[in-house]
Amino acid sequence: MFYFLIIVLMVFQAIFNIRLRLFIWEKPEHAWLNRAPTVFRDPCLTFTILLPAKNEEDVYRETIQKVYDLNYPKELMQIIAICREDDPGTIAEAQAKIDELGDPNVQLLIYNDYPVSKPHGLNLGLQVARGDVVTIFDAEDEPHTDILNIINTTMIDGDIDAVQSGVQLMNHNTRWFCFLNVLEYFFWFKSSMHFFARIGMTPLGGNTVFVRRELLEQLGGWDENCLTEDAELGIRLSLSHARLRIIYEDEYVTREETPHTIEQFIRQRTRWNQGFIQILFKLEWLKLEKLSQRLLAFYVLILPEVQALFAILLPVAIIMFFFVKFPLWLAMLTFIPLYCFILSLFLDLAGLHEFLKAHNRKWKWGESIILVLAFFPYQWILSLAALRAVYREIKGTSNWEKTAHIGQHRSKIAA
């Protein structure tokens, strides 16, 4: 029975994950309905753009410039660079760029209080925000130049409270694990987010999220003690019946980079997993009205524990497969998870083709071979990060493990 339950759990998780990834292709009308507007309204809404940063000397100055260069009237934009006092390098880069721009609407907010976390900095930025709409870009982001026109038009036309636009990692071939990391983002924002929005339970992405300031203030801003403040805010927006819109087009994604080492990747994924665990035990998701919303929230938030469980049980399952005699029907059943993994692998190959085509890059058979070889090691890394997240949560460790950025998506390698 124990072995049977492991198999059922693995099969369910694999099939539902495949369902999420294929949703937008199964129902292409959702993609059409959530396209960016082709004709922009005259700029009307004002925007406050929060740029939190920590130890981002390598990328921050260029990011401030790229955000300032967005195709939108400068008098309708407020840009707030957010740094902590103990980060003189990033502060110096930000101040140098702000002095160069010479625009009073581009400001530097320096704080020295606690907690030391991204959402705390965001809340301080919210206190001085003047825009009708508040948004966040990460320190290495490259938003599309027309993103504010898109959001301005979308929010006015649909009387929308919040918009999640697409985010995409771009350096798919700089490290062996980058292929699958890039595809996670590709499927998540292109397909899965539309499924979440349809159900009415949307764990928001970390940036390129646009929320009306008054609503954000009513909700109390971001949870300063949560490691995934974006997803937690998404739950509260769903509870408040906010009118949320998902927009995804490959042309308009905000470009980012993957972590540049396996250690950085594990630390990043650990933080995300632990944040989901925090939200799970906060129990706010249980207040969602519909059973489908609560079940979906539970599935998304329980994934870290499921991955950790798989990491523990997989060796046990392998030992039992070779040394325990099973009935024929159960022995045949043990191959179903393998078939699901193979299907997921082919789906990743198809996703790589779609990603390359969408961003005008050439298909290379060598890259597809690397993806295939990396598939199972990548799953083990995810399981390790999940185990680490569970361990940290049990231990009571919740410090913010920062992901370093070096601008890989801005180099020729990422092309």
For the regions a protein language model found, what residue spans apply to each?
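Cell-envelope/extracellular polymer assembly enzymes that use nucleotide-activated donors
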Residues: 45-48, 78, 232
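A conserved acidic beta->alpha catalytic loop
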Residues: 83-94, 113-115
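Membrane-embedded multi-pass helical conduit in multi-pass membrane proteins
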Residues: 38-41, 300-395
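Catalytic donor-sugar/metal-binding loop of nucleotide-sugar-dependent glycosyltransferases
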Residues: 235-254
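Long helical/loop segments within the catalytic core of UDP-sugar-dependent glycosyltransferases
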Residues: 98-103, 108-111, 115-127, 131-132, ...
